[in-house]
Amino acid sequence: MLTLTRICAVSYEVRSTFLFISVLEFAVGFLTNAFIFLVNFWDVVKRQPLSNSDCVLLCLSISRLFLHGLLFLSAIQLTHFQKLSEPLNHSYQAIIMLWIIANQANLWLAACLSLLYCSKLIRFSHTFLICLASWVSRKISQMLLGIILCSCICTVLCVWCFFSRPHFTVTTFLFMNNNTRLNWQIKDLNLFYSFLFCYLWSVPPFLLFLVSSGMLTVSLGRHMRTMKVYTRDSRDPSLEAHIKALKSLVSFFCFFVISSCAAFISVPLLILWRNKIGVMVCVGIMAACPSGHAAVLISGNATLRRAVTTILLWAQSSMKVRADHKADSRTLC
């Protein structure tokens, strides 16, 4: 199917603004996820045992760092190398494919975190579910290795699917009454096919995430009804744990849906319609979502909150020492 595309230039001001926003998003995303990684990795260096949830957060932060790096490279490609009048260059296509795979690994890790919350917080009555929850708690490291293996398999399949299809271009020119040249161009539809193929692999972890999150929501409602009947204490540790877990899961769901919608919209905008401004908006949305969820994870994790408090106290004391030193030097003068 041929799509009518108007070739329009993007101004220098728009490109500069987009690049500035991309730098800010990359800096915020890199700092938040690097903070999560360093806090958990420091425990590994000190040979302190990491909890299962901390192991998942460690892997999740690594995948987010890759996501932010790829999105920043995508922003540089859009502003400096990829032209509207030309087909997609191979480097930009490679960035898109790598982002899809990293995003899929991110979804698998979120599903793993959701299962872990279910195994810890939900009180099952059925024997099979009790055994399944115990198995999840014991096999979390194997699950993480399985996620890495699945991501590698998906990488190989996506690369094979991408490079095995023949590349073709159909280009025609149409001159309208106002002498506006319109370009009909279909180029590298195999990229779009590979995009859809990779996202099919996201269906199992997404369903797993939805089912486990739904079970956690039902457990929270049941627990709240039990509290209303038997106790009036609002500060219940189990209730607070349920709420914190659901906050992180619901926020991930919202950010993931927004990011996925932006990614789906950006593909036809770039391949068929050649609307670079629309692609820039989509890339900006996709870069903001991982940073937002990282902030939610930091606020809901006790270890990360303590690390933030320690850093803030250190910064405050350092500023106070510098201020006192300047005051003393002025007094001596």
Swiss-Prot record:
Residues with attached carbohydrate: N178
Pfam family, one: TAS2R
Cleavable signal peptide: none
Tree of life domain: Eukaryota
Annotated GO MF terms: bitter taste receptor activity; G protein-coupled receptor activity
TM region(s), chain numbering: 18-38, 56-76, 95-115, 143-163, 191-211, 252-272, 277-297
Membrane topology category: Multi-pass membrane protein
Keyword annotations: G-protein coupled receptor, Glycoprotein, Membrane, Receptor, Sensory transduction, Taste, Transducer, Transmembrane, Transmembrane helix
Cytoplasmic compartment spans: 39-55, 116-142, 212-251, 298-333
Positions in the Extracellular compartment: 1-17, 77-94, 164-190, 273-276
Main location: membrane
GO cellular component, one term: plasma membrane
Subcellular location: Membrane
Family statement drawn from the similarity comment of this UniProt entry: Belongs to the G-protein coupled receptor T2R family.
Role summary: Receptor that may play a role in the perception of bitterness and is gustducin-linked. May play a role in sensing the chemical composition of the gastrointestinal content. The activity of this receptor may stimulate alpha gustducin, mediate PLC-beta-2 activation and lead to the gating of TRPM5.
Record's miscellaneous remark: Most taste cells may be activated by a limited number of bitter compounds; individual taste cells can discriminate among bitter stimuli.
Name of the featured protein: Taste receptor type 2 member 38
UniProt source species: Pongo pygmaeus (Bornean orangutan)
Name of the gene encoding the protein in the UniProt record: TAS2R38
